[in-house]
Curated annotation (Swiss-Prot):
Taxonomic source organism: Escherichia coli O17:K52:H18 (strain UMN026 / ExPEC)
Catalyzed reaction equations: L-methionyl-[protein] + a quinone + H2O = L-methionyl-(S)-S-oxide-[protein] + a quinol; L-methionyl-[protein] + a quinone + H2O = L-methionyl-(R)-S-oxide-[protein] + a quinol
SUPFAM superfamilies listed in its UniProt record: Oxidoreductase molybdopterin-binding domain
Record family assignment: Belongs to the MsrP family.
Protein name, as recorded: Protein-methionine-sulfoxide reductase catalytic subunit MsrP
GO BP annotations, alphabetical order: protein repair
Amino acid sequence: MKKNQFLKESDVTAESVFFMKRRQVLKALGISAAALSLPHAAHADLLSWFKGNDRPPAPAGKPLEFSKPAAWQNDLPLTPADKVSGYNNFYEFGLDKADPAANAGSLKTDPWTLKISGEVAKPLTLDHDDLTRRFPLEERIYRMRCVEAWSMVVPWIGFPLHKLLALAEPTSNAKYVAFETIYAPEQMPGQQDRFIGGGLKYPYVEGLRLDEAMHPLTLMTVGVYGKALPPQNGAPVRLIVPWKYGFKGIKSIVSIKLTRECPPTTWNLAAPDEYGFYANVNPHVDHPRWSQATERFIGSGGILDVQRQPTLLFNGYADQVASLYRGLDLRENF
């Protein structure tokens, strides 16, 4: 795997930044916050995050054993851990960036069951311990780009999805992979209340083409900053597809199903003109209500240090993934 030329270790989103808000912006859902433009709301959240000293501390997750393959290390500046764990989108726990950190402690992640089914020869069921022990774990420093035009650099820990799928032996009929988040309204207030959860239909679902799922970059993620994922970041296991917008990174996964047909995805169902199935990071294809040409990188500095930078095609991973979409109109298939 070629070392990513766009990432330097100094670019990684610091540990304190990675972990917190995204408001509901879909006019079709009839939620009052939907009138807000996502970038404006997201930047307001950035201001509230940086202006005070009341940021929640980075959670103390269980330390993990993992390797650091050279191919996945780089010199990008990391987003601090407290920002990674305190500034994020997980509508099942509320719309504000700080809501997941404040409310996700109610999520019970052990015991846990992850089922792999559908067009496979050998259906599998993994428990909580399997997620960190069945496959060798490795740290990968990835860029993360939100559709709201902000970004981070994060040292995720996990294993390639293709290793898990290989155990299940996809059949020749398998063309897509469908993912589903846990449905637990008693633990997730956004699944109980339409207003709290942004008017989305739950459980949250996502999907990839099989070749995307099998790509070496696609990561089943169980940790960050050397420790197990905190609940607000999608514990105990989430998906990271670094060349796609962050909403493709489904959290707290309980089901992976291989299918013949393209599966439904939550944001595409909610607003098909705004959120496509592919959701590849593309500076040349704007969201209908804001530009995707630039992004705000969340690093270790304060609000005055947050700078706009050019958005990279496929989030800087074009050398690795552009061939997946050869001949595909990226404007039509956004």
